[in-house]
Amino acid sequence: MQQPDEVTLTIDGKEVAVPKGTLVLHAAQKLGIDVPTFCYNNKMDPLGACRMCLVSIEKQKGFPPACATPVAPGMIVTTKSEAVEKTRKSMLEFLLINHPLDCPICDKGGECPLQNLTFKFGPGRSRFVENKRRFQKHLQVGPQIVLDRERCILCQLCVRFMEDIVDDAQLVMINRGDSTEIGTFPGRPLDSVFSGNVTDICPVGALTSQSYRFQSRPWDLAHTPSVCPTCPVGCNIDVNTRRGQLMRLTPRENITVDDGWLCDIGRYGTLSWARYERVTSPLIKKNGHFLPASWDEALQAAEHGLRAARTGGTLAGLASARGTNEELYLFGRLLRGGLRTPHLDTLNGSRGGTATLGGAPIAAIEDADAIVLVDADPIARQMVLHLRLTKQAKRRGIQPVIISNDDTGLDKFAGAKLSFQPTNLSATVRALADAVRAARAGLNPAAAPRTGSDDLRSGQSGAAAQTDVAAPATSDTAAGPQTDGQRTDDQAAPGHAHGIAGALAGLSDAVSNLAETVTNAVPGLTHHESQEGPAGQTAQTGAATVSAGAGAQATAARPEAILAAGQLLATAKRGLVVYDERVLDEPDGQATLDAIRDLEALLAELDTLPTARVLALSKDTNSRGAAEMGVAPAVLPGGRPISDLEWFNEVQSSWGLPMLNETGLDAAGILRAAAGGELDGLFLMDTDPIMEWPDEDVAREALARVPFLLAQTALLTPSAQQADVILPAAGVFEESGSLTNLEGRVQTLGRAVEIPGEARDGWDILAELSNRFGVVQTYESAAVVSQEIADTLRLSAWQALGQFPEREPAPEQRELVTAGGGA
């Protein structure tokens, strides 16, 4: 039965019902009818530039483009008539007039839509005898991208991607008519961190990757489904290899995670991950020099060193939060159960990991009608997430409230931006929550804001609350209205200040009290009713006026900015708070987390869906997985706190190993203890403190002074060079296993490249080492370890984990034959 909001039409004799506003192209796709396109991309607005999707519609003249024509009731569409196919053939002939016959050398050959559609619809011979357009063949338009303008068919996908998706128009259309070409602005290269995506969406070989040019043919490549190991977003990728060598990475679209895009750091950076010499056999240091050893000798030496350290003193372990869940699980079990030490952590720390459990999914950004970013700038660390937030700002008009002391990639869209005192971020978040209550009180006077003695933390006096509800970091801009039309960090976006002033005018004394609360905590600010100060020194907030006191420096989160931000969030039905886990490294980290939870609860009051509305942004690829596997001093496997005695006993029983029920040293404490001569043994799993720890001197001193240092690593890093024993492990794209992204989604990795030499899977090494410390368990594959994780830790995300992807068989290797016929 047709729904009220649906339209019924007929395409090629088949009837279909689709929602109103659906494009003819999508309606045809619903029926499984293939309509060819070049310029269409479902993530961009339709353009109708290539004219390949022309169809015939009864009672309409001409051939309208299916990609830009909405359906209508009773519409009769034909996609396969003789007239339609003749039109497509003509369009292909037109596109091929200036297109060079580069197919034998073009990197796009074999996966080229123009090539494919020409074989299917196009003419077999060209009638064009005049000279074709000629351009420089190899034009380096950016560090990673090469442009061949002769091949370009002017579909404008690349231009629209940079302008509409990235919001950075680095590619433009130049000139007009038959002189039109794609190019960059003079003196400005295509250096966007998302530039590699233009090579994926280009339907011809006009835009190619510098690193992949002339390297391989698509039919010679083996493809392995995997996950990008660069950051915690967990973008899905296909690893393309040829004869065991990495060739390129391409996106494997997962709409709920990456929206089909990749950043250049992940796309190109991981191809050259081996920055140091590769370790392919076990090494034991004797007389200051590494000597090759057998696996049995190396494991025996590792066992001896760890036993001596455990017996004689203190033992600790540091793991990489880039490791797989399987490695981290076995590492934690070895340290906690086999070696009975509570001192384990990832180098960047997983102590905040429990805060992320049960958080919002990435897809929550799509339906959010208000977003708060707390010291978070995804373009810096979780890049693809930035594109999703940009899309919401551009397409839905979402104006995020940004709490940050730095310039961020989303500042241009901000409805309000609040700075904070570096040691008191929590106060700004609490003040924002109070501002939301104040704004709601204006819309509904019965809802009184909680200020003064009703501060977010119950039991505090009004004076104490006033002292804490502040964000007094100084800035270079005086508090006051702008004269150049530009918005400063702590001002509402243009068009909001007046509306907020009107909305807040006439509020109850509670609103004035909120401004008073904020003002009293900001040094140099005075609060007074309806009183003007010197020109350029006042800011109206409706019920109150806030001005800079005499001789005071300009301050950070001004009360009017906080109130403006509160107004933006007051009516949100699907509010979302996004914070970077680095806030937990601040002195008031836990207080900030509590304030964020309070803000989440406040936003959830108008939310009809009972889902989490906080998204935590971690730093490393598998930070959340590390916390869930218990590689943190205060966190048990399963992501539960060490204080959960019932769960502690259950894990201990499952493992059959006694554990110490105490909170151990974190990464900083472990390195300090080692540097102070208080540590007798240290196990480094795929981590390099010398290069990754903020204080290199402390890291070097720590590794130099520890009596026994064991390193499990794929590379001979500066830290590994200090080790007494090195166990060679698999590297990037050589291991199978799983990673947990920042939203808690467990995704599997496929082995794309064989492990070189005598190196082994990390989980295999840890299982072998664990057997020497009473953990009697053998594993045939990483999948078996994964099943144990699911059974033991009962994490919901693991229950539906499928089989690990396998690399598809490589094409049959052919002997290369020279022109003379010899091999």
Show which residues each predicted segment covers.
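Fe-S ferredoxin-like electron-transfer domains
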Residues: R51-P229, V233-I237, R242-L249
